Amino acid sequence: ETSLPPDISEIKHFMAEYGYSVGKEEVTFDRSSQKMYFEAEKFLTNGEMLAITKILIATRTLPQDKMNQLIEKLEEFASTKDKKRLKELVKRELYHYKPVATLCNDLIDNLYALAEAIDDKQEITITYYKMDKSRIDRRIRPLAIVFSEYYFYLIAVHETDGEWKERYYRVDRITDMIKHRTHFEVEYDSRFDEGKLKNEIQYMWPGKEQQIVFEFTGPSVQAILDRIPKSKVIKREKDKVTIQATVVHGTGIKMTLLSQGSWVKVLSPQSFVDEMKEEVEKMMERYR
């Protein structure tokens, strides 16, 4: 006869005493392997674990060693029986994983240090490398962090000529940070809304909010609606749809629409139509 470990009430008492809250628990004993398995509804399920792992790998945002460490830690929350299966399901993706280049020593440490400054409403000075590799040291007020297309971005305001202007900084290009004793206040109605920004901006190129209308003749209308969250179909015809969207005007939305090739034709506003025409003409010149 095989003796079993303490009953579930004792296990639950032990975990509660040490700060665990696991909800509905189930303990099973596998006689073939002589192992006890503990499962709880607040642990990640196998499906949840696989989904999170796949999403993490697709971001390409962390160095290889950091990605491996993070996935190994997450696997500890998966069901014990299927850890091996989960490893098998992602091992080829991890083997071929190609992270994006970063300049900072530790992206995760950077993120948390910035998050603390945001939460404490604390002014900071960052050492930052721009796209052209030039270095700047800038005193800013950090407001939010967002993730977009492989990179984390810090949204902050910077004082220029007595005015606080919004700026975006890639977190992986911040190589040093000094926290100052100066704190700032943000009125409730003036708080930065990163959710709203994410629904309107493309590729984190800044600009003013603008409503645009364009025709789309591509095979998947839903794909373009998903790519531009604040968009809707306002007219359907046999071979095309007309879409209205609220976007951040600038390079980002042009990149998105141009990526659809001849499937897109911008209808309004006229100023944006002219910008798109000019961009297409520049592209044509490169092929002449």
Language-model segments: what does each one mean?
Residues E25, S32-Q34, Y150, D172, ...:
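Beta-strand-connecting loop/turn residues
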Residues G195-R288:
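Polybasic (Lys/Arg-rich)
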Residues L44, K133-I136, G162-W164, V221-I224, ...:
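Short, surface-exposed beta-strand/loop "edge" segments at domain boundaries and coil↔beta transitions
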Residues E1-I55, K282-R288:
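Short, basic/aromatic recognition patches that contact phosphate-bearing ligands
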Residues Y37, T125, Y153-I155, T242, ...:
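General beta-strand recognition
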Residues S33, F38-F43, V157-T160, A245-H249:
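Secondary-structure transition/turn motif
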Residues E39-Y129:
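Bulky hydrophobic/aromatic content
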